[in-house]
Swiss-Prot record:
The gene is PMAP36. GO terms for molecular function: lipopolysaccharide binding. Gene3D superfamilies: 3.10.450.10. The lineage of its organism: Eukaryota, Metazoa, Chordata, Craniata, Vertebrata. GO terms for cellular component: extracellular space. This is Antibacterial peptide PMAP-36. It comes from Sus scrofa.
Amino acid sequence: METQRASLCLGRWSLWLLLLGLVVPSASAQALSYREAVLRAVDRLNEQSSEANLYRLLELDQPPKADEDPGTPKPVSFTVKETVCPRPTWRPPELCDFKENGRVKQCVGTVTLNPSNDPLDINCDEIQSVGRFRRLRKKTRKRLKKIGKVLKWIPPIVGSIPLGCG
């Protein structure tokens, strides 16, 4: 009789814990904002860089139109600038001042808003002068338009691929 009561009580606690787990979303399961995803991409850029100083987000271009799926790659375009913080300190770049006459890079590619996925395909080119900057921005916008067009076609293509044996 005592074991039945203990088992029933344990079952109730298990049910409560299960319901609590379903109701309270975990922090890792929540989608990132567009800006947060770009900041993660900048962090990744700093991790993979062999340069002496950290880079920090200087300018973020307009986000793409809203897409409900956080796992879908989103086209992104942003500019980073070299800071005064040396890379080995691993200080958060947001706390670092921009370096006077520091390098500026224009970055394009795709990111996902799903925090469990790493940023995808980010390429950065150093900006040399104002004239080149304008040309680079034009190229960047063209690349983003192409990426956006390709991403629009992915769901219909994937949906038309037969997955079963027959």
